[in-house]
């Protein structure tokens, strides 16, 4: 049996479970069509001569799940691609203890769960997986509506109109003059009567003392 076919068969028969030895990030990612995606698998053990495999599962994990072998990283050969894989879209490289799966120009059919895996003796060790969702349009977040503030209306009192022209009409002016004349006449009469009374009092006193 060819090694790659054996690998796929082993992945089908092995119970799939997340392991702390291989930590995958992020757990979920949603990207737009034709974008680039980088999935990380960090090994918590020394993998000097061990290969890291990347598999894809297009449906939710189950007993009938099918795993596609995409590529592996080999310390001597670098990236080795699986059969019927677009090699120009998939690359695997190492960055210290992390193994990166790089996907370019992703399409909606690339959506699925991506697992990194190492082959032990005899067990297989899987990461917890990264779910990739490729969509044509990313959802837009609605902007919070701003409350409109009501402006207070300022009531302004009408300005008093300045009177143009003469302040007093001729009739009013005539009445004022007449009133002044009446006061003067009354004052003159009062003074005259007062003087006459004084003279009469003086004459009476002179007659009394004779």
From Swiss-Prot:
Domain Ig-like V-type: 22-132
Changes after translation: Phosphorylated as a consequence of T-cell activation. Palmitoylated at the cytoplasmic tail and thereby targets the heterodimer CD8A/CD8B to lipid rafts unlike CD8A homodimers.
Gene3D superfamilies given in the database record: Immunoglobulins
CDD domains (UniProt xref): IgV_CD8_beta (cd07700)
Topology, Extracellular side: 22-170
Glycan attachment points: 102
A Gene Ontology molecular function term of the record: MHC class I protein binding
Regions crossing the membrane: 171-191
Biological process (GO), any one: T cell receptor signaling pathway
Keyword check for Amino-acid biosynthesis: no
Tissue specificity note: Isoform 1, isoform 3, isoform 5, isoform 6, isoform 7 and isoform 8 are expressed in both thymus and peripheral CD8+ T-cells. Expression of isoform 1 is higher in thymus CD8+ T-cells than in peripheral CD8+ T-cells. Expression of isoform 6 is higher in peripheral CD8+ T-cells than in thymus CD8+ T-cells.
Name the UniProt record assigns to this protein: T-cell surface glycoprotein CD8 beta chain
Protein species of origin: Homo sapiens
Gene that this polypeptide is encoded by: CD8B
């Amino acid at each position: 049996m060819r090694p790659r076919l054996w690998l796929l068969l082993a992945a089908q028969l092995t119970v799939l479970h997340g392991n702390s030895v291989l930590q995958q990030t992020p757990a979920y990612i949603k990207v737009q069509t034709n974008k680039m995606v980088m999935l990380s698998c960090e090994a918590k053990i020394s993998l000097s001569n061990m290969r890291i495999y990347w598999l894809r599962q297009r449906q939710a994990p189950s007993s009938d799940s099918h795993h596609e072998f995409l590529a592996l990283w080999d310390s001597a050969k670098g990236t080795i691609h699986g059969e019927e894989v677009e090699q120009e879209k998939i690359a695997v490289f190492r960055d210290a203890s992390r193994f990166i799966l790089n996907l370019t120009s992703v399409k909606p059919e690339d959506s699925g769960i991506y697992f990194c895996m190492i082959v032990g003796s005899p067990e297989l060790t899987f990461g917890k997986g990264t779910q990739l969702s490729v969509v044509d349009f990313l959802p837009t977040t609605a902007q919070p509506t701003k409350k409109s503030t009501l402006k207070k209306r300022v009531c302004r009192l009408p300005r008093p109109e300045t009177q143009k022209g003469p302040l007093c009409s001729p009739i009013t002016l005539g009445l004022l003059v007449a009133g002044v004349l009446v006061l003067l006449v009354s004052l003159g009469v009062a003074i005259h009567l007062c003087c006459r009374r004084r003279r009469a009092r003086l004459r009476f006193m002179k007659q009394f003392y004779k």
